[in-house]
């Protein structure tokens, strides 16, 4: 997870710019600001940003200091899962579970990227571990610790943290020590702690006057609670209402077709699906063999814990109709790895005594190999021989397991060794290849994907583009069984990254602002482009003492400029450029006070729609937050009004040195604004 960690550069520049701001300004860190100007906040909880900011303060902000905490989170998740499984199922299952999680492609991906998901997964695993400790000790403090971990996860990625909550509650109520009334009371007490930790920071933000804090990024009413339960809540599941549908991720069409087989879809399967059949068998078998165990049996309890967690995540991820990214599946990677390990170890032990268990093991290995064969086929040209090796190994393992029940003891030993080696290849051959491939190329933007270039969808690596779909129906196998669809080689429409983004400095990444790109979004993905060095040099040399280097529309434009220059940049409108902050009055005040000389228009996605609100004037206040207005939808757009004011009052500049004209990166224009203009 740590090897070649900086290959992705600043990765998602939306979070990178916020982390850079947090590393330089305690105020920006506390308010979870999206940049050094502090007009708009991130659209997620503050914890991941704080982690990156603290690391930057200690090590100096860089790609390494930003991504190192993510890698540490990934390693700790593996370690904690190992201890959780060891306490309940023994050392062998623990080692297998840790290995499977470490080789799960989506886990490797998020552990090397600056999205909040690595920290989220760590806190969810830690909460599950604390519940196991509560079952062991019977002490309330472990239950409270579990609630604290979930609350911290809520401060990382809001309601997604609660995917683990049903599993924690059900497990303690079913298998916890003591009478039911006592268990209910303790669960209620933990719930109170959970609520307090979850909403402590968000509640504090809402007590601060809107004029003295950043505007809540991607909200429609400048409310953290509206963002939590709207755009990042109901609309993520229903696909309707609650926000603009963008935020730190882009669009709703990135995650395949909703339905029970969504996680096997061509666009998602390579991230998480490898072990799903084995995990399902492991859950069913584990509960069956422990059907007569005492209520407090830890072995059954951990199956309930991991099973409810995985099933809850499967249901939400499979049927959510709002914005979806394949890396969201990292939230269920730990329970899937744990259940798959439990199934493997349990079936191997049971197969020695019962023929029907041997048959179940053989079938599970065959199914796992067949799925890996299909998933590997989604990456044309990627070690094409491996899929046949995996399929052959699965068949060999299945035959060896079945033959072991009818041959003599001497031959059985040799078959057992052959079955073990073949089973290992069948189970981990595919995901480990995808995991290793993830280490080998950089990615950028808001929708990274694990695996080799050309698998699934999106773009990654220099000058390359991922495929939107790979052949699902034409080659048979799991394509037909698990609903895998789409013509081979079909690419997404030109509307930004189809997935993984581009490596910094690649042809695809040189699209905003400047470089040699042909315009924003062809492969770089939102939050993944590099700043034009010529533009940055011009702004630096013509800053003339201004507090802010430039104001730019949307974080995908402003973020790279701030990262390249290290100077405060105003992100007009937040992530998509649609947030009503700063207001026109605030922008005018900044120009009048000499705190801002240049504005870069274009590149955001507010269009002509935008969102009204956020009136008032803060002049050059560092945390204008829209001037206290509550935002909301309106007939007039603040983003359009900002653009109209700039084009009316400021002078277009060609920073390449030609005569004044509406010049700049493709689709963008740089304007010079002076105090006399205001």
Regions found by a protein language model. Name each.
Residues 1-359, 367-370, 437, 484-487, ...:
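Membrane-integral, polyisoprenol-dependent glycosyltransferases
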């Amino acid at each position: 997870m740590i090897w070649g960690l900086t290959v992705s550069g600043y990765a998602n520049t939306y979070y990178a710019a916020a982390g850079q701001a947090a590393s330089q300004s305690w105020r920006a860190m506390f308010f979870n600001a999206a940049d050094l100007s502090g007009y708009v906040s991130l659209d997620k909880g503050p914890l991941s940003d704080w982690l990156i900011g603290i690391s930057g303060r200690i090590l100096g902000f860089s790609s390494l200091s930003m991504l190192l905490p993510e890698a540490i989170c990934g390693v700790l998740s593996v370690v904690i899962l190992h201890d959780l499984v060891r306490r309940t199922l023994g050392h062998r299952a623990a080692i297998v579970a840790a290995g499977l999680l470490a080789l799960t492609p989506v886990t490797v991906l998020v552990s090397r990227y600056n999205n909040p998901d690595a920290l989220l997964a760590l806190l969810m695993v830690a909460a599950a571990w604390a519940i196991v400790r509560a079952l062991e000790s019977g002490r309330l403090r472990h239950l409270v610790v579990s609630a604290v971990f979930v609350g911290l996860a809520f401060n990382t990625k809001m309601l997604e943290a609660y995917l683990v909550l049903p599993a924690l509650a059900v497990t303690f109520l079913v298998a916890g020590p003591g009478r039911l009334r006592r268990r209910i009371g303790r669960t209620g007490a933990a719930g109170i702690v959970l609520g307090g930790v979850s909403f402590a920071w968000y509640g504090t933000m809402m007590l601060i006057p809107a004029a003295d804090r950043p505007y809540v990024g991607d909200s429609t009413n400048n409310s953290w609670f509206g963002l939590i339960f709207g755009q990042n809540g109901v609309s993520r599941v229903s696909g309707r209402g609650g926000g603009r549908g963008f935020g730190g991720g882009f669009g709703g069409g990135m995650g395949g077709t909703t339905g029970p087989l969504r996680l096997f879809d061509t666009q998602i399967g390579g991230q998480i699906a490898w072990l799903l059949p084995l995990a399902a068998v492991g859950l069913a078998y584990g509960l069956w063999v422990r059907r007569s165990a005492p209520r407090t049996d830890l072995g059954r309890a951990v199956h309930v814990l991991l099973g409810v967690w995985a099933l809850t995540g499967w249901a939400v991820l499979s049927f959510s109709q709002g914005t979806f990214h394949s890396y969201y599946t990292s939230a269920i990677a730990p329970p899937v790895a744990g259940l798959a390990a439990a199934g493997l170890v349990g079936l191997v032990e049971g197969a020695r005594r019962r023929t029907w268990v041997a048959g179940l093991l053989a079938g599970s290995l065959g199914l796992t190999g067949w799925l890996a064969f299909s998933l590997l086929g989604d990456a044309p040209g990627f070690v094409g021989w491996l899929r046949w090796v995996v399929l052959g190994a699965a068949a060999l393992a299945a035959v060896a397991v079945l033959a072991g029940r009818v041959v003599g003891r001497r031959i059985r030993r040799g078959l057992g060794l052959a079955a073990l080696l073949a089973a290992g290849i069948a189970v981990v051959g595919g995901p480990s290849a995808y995991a290793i491939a993830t280490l080998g190329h950089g990615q950028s933007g808001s929708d990274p994907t694990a695996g080799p270039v050309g698998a699934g969808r999106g773009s990654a690596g220099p000058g390359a583009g991922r495929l939107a779909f790979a052949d699902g129906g034409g080659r048979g196998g799991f394509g037909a069984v698990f609903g895998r669809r789409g013509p081979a080689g079909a690419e997404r429409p030109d509307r930004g990254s189809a997935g993984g983004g581009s490596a910094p400095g690649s042809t695809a990444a040189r699209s905003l602002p400047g470089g040699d790109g042909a315009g924003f979004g062809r492969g770089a993905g939102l939050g993944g482009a590099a700043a034009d060095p010529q533009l940055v040099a011009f702004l630096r040399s013509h800053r003339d003492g201004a507090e802010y280097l430039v104001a730019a529309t949307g974080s995908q434009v402003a973020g790279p400029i701030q990262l390249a220059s290290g100077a405060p940049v105003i992100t007009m409108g937040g992530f998509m450029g649609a947030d009503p902050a700063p207001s026109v009055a605030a922008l005018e005040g900044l120009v009048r006070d000499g705190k801002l000389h240049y504005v870069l228009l274009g590149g955001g996605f507010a269009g002509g729609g935008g969102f009204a609100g956020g009136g008032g004037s803060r002049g050059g206040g560092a945390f204008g937050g829209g001037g206290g207005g509550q935002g909301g939808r309106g007939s007039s757009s603040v983003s359009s009004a900002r653009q109209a004011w700039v084009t009316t009052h400021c002078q277009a500049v060609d920073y390449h040195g030609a005569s004044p004209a509406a010049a700049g990166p493709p689709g963008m224009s740089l304007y010079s604004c002076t105090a006399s203009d205001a």
